[in-house]
A protein has these predicted regions:
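Carbohydrate-active catalytic/glycan-binding domains of CAZyme proteins
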Residues: 1-293
Length: 293
């Protein structure tokens, strides 16, 4: 690749109608100062399933194709009329599909596809992400779901593999936390170690960071990250993601969804020591055009 590096942030935003729960783009040259694409309006709309999309992620395949995945959910249209204004209903009676779009050039996009990964007793498919597994030569799609096996109680992390985003393996359980629901998984690698960000719904009611030697092997909690997170109110942050800045440091974004609506959206934290889970909030060094989620 020649020329300047450009960051692309695929996201949604909170709104009073379905225009927020669509595919939005923002770009940056330094990973800190973001500019909206299309004047802050959706780049394109979800027209299938619930006609909205949240928890978006993007992957560049080994062949250079771009894949966008997202949760098939439209809160603005369906929270009241479909789910009777009850969050547990979203986890139990939610969409059984993952929304997907494809592109060769980031400009021309395919029609929306609804990925059917099999029944499996799932009550929802939240926060889908995908990554390439070099040794296996395939892609792992992972997400959070409730399941009929525990009467749609605590959510856990499940995964499915594919080589072409057409044929998928039967979903399997990747991780569950005995005493709590786990949602918003995000895996990434730094050096020889894999890291896993998760939102725990109890003990603690916060984002947690874990480290492991292999992608799907055993992980250990990083207690220093727990101590760092404890300075913030319980259950104010969720949907963690991480990416490298030009200086090589990791930027951790946490979605603030507390009671102050004008503050909702991602808040940036930059690591001073990833190995020990140490981060520093740097909101004053970042710019977001609005509350990106």
């Amino acid at each position: 690749m020649t020329g300047k590096q450009i960051y692309l942030f695929v996201h949604y935003r909170e709104a009073d109608d379905r225009s927020g729960e669509q595919v939005h783009f923002a770009v940056s040259t330094d990973g800190r100062h973001w500019k909206s694409v299309n004047h802050g309006q959706p780049v394109f709309f979800a027209e299938k399933g619930e006609r909205g999309v949240r928890d978006l992620s993007i992957l560049r395949t080994q062949e250079g194709k771009y894949i966008i995945l997202g949760t098939d959910l439209c809160m603005s249209e369906n929270f009241v009329k479909k789910y009777n204004s009850k969050w547990p209903n979203i986890g139990r009676f939610g969409s059984r599909y993952i929304s997907m779009w494809e592109s060769e050039d980031l400009v021309h996009w395919s029609d929306q596809r609804l990925l059917d990964l099999g029944d499996g007793g799932f009550g929802c498919f939240w926060g889908p992400e995908a990554l390439y597994r070099e040794e296996e030569g395939d892609y792992l799609i992972y997400w959070a779901s409730s399941n009929e096996v525990n009467n749609y109680g605590a959510k856990a992390i499940y995964g499915s593999t594919t080589k072409d985003f057409r044929v998928f393996s039967k979903p399997v359980l990747l991780y569950e936390k005995e005493e709590a629901s786990i949602v918003d998984p995000f895996y990434f690698k730094d050096g020889e170690n894999y890291y896993r960000l998760l939102k725990s719904r109890q003990n603690p009611f916060a984002v947690i960071l874990e480290r492991g030697k292999t992608l799907l092997g055993k992980y250990e909690r990083l207690p220093e990250f727990d101590r760092w997170m404890s300075q913030y109110k319980a259950n104010e942050y969720e949907a963690p993601i991480a990416y490298r800045l030009p200086d090589g440091k990791w930027c951790l974004l946490l979605d603030y969804f507390g009671k102050e609506r004008d503050r909702t959206g991602y808040v940036p934290f930059v690591e001073s020591d990833l190995y020990h889970g140490k981060f520093q909030e740097e909101s004053e060094k970042f710019f977001f055009p609005y509350g990106m989620k």
